[in-house]
């Protein structure tokens, strides 16, 4: 289940991005709640609410490409929690994959 706590235009884009990622990584049973916020002290953050359930906050005050990459970055953290596989705090992997995933999303891969 994916829930975007927003009624503005990014809602459809966010739903599509999260659905694409979860399907691609076989995480369709995972629940993700996304909170797009105009002002944050960072670009995005993710937290585990409970097993299989996550909350992502993402700043909308950035370019479209950076916004998509930020959502992907936080979804990599969701994947890390779900699989139990990461090194350190998982940031290096998320940073390495965020723009690659964003570009693959835009290219429809």
Regions found by a protein language model. Give the residues of each.
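Zn2+-dependent metallopeptidase catalytic core
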Residues: 7-29
């Amino acid at each position: 289940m994916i829930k975007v706590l927003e009624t503005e235009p990014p809602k459809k884009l966010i739903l599509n991005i999260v659905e694409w990622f979860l399907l691609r990584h076989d995480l369709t049973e995972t629940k993700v709640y996304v909170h797009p916020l105009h002002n944050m002290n960072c670009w995005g953050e993710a937290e585990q609410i409970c097993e299989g359930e996550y909350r992502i906050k993402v700043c909308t005050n950035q370019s479209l490409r950076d916004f998509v990459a930020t959502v992907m970055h936080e979804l990599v953290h969701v994947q890390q929690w779900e699989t139990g596989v990461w090194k350190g705090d998982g940031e290096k992997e998320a940073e390495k994959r965020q723009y690659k995933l964003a570009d693959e999303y835009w290219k429809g891969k």
